[in-house]
């Protein structure tokens, strides 16, 4: 009897489609340029922003569903500076979202520690809230 129950459980789990998996963060961080999914897939270290370079907060997320709301922010200490928000029109196996500035603010970036902050909302409830480690812009 137990064998039949375990077999039925294995069949039920195996039949769940891939899109039903939980959303998960594949990458979250800061770079000195707009990143591509190919760069993130390679896993090579990305150049960190400095006070006199562009600064882009990025995230790559897997298994998002239609209607999910994804927000990425470039944050200095506790002050959000720039953000990008997208409501997905369809399911996404992998989704890349970025926010930042391709240029450099006059006089450079303000002093402080910067990080990327991510929020994913599903059905009006927070699903993921995560931040990258803070880095100073030297």
Locate predicted features.
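Short, compositionally biased P/S/T/A/G/V-rich stretches that sit at domain boundaries
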Residues: 18-55, 138
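Conserved aromatic beta-strand anchor motif in extracellular beta-sandwich/beta-rich domains
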Residues: 72-76, 120
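Solvent-exposed serine/threonine-rich low-complexity stretches and specific carbohydrate-binding patches
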Residues: 80-93
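Short beta-strand elements
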Residues: 126-138
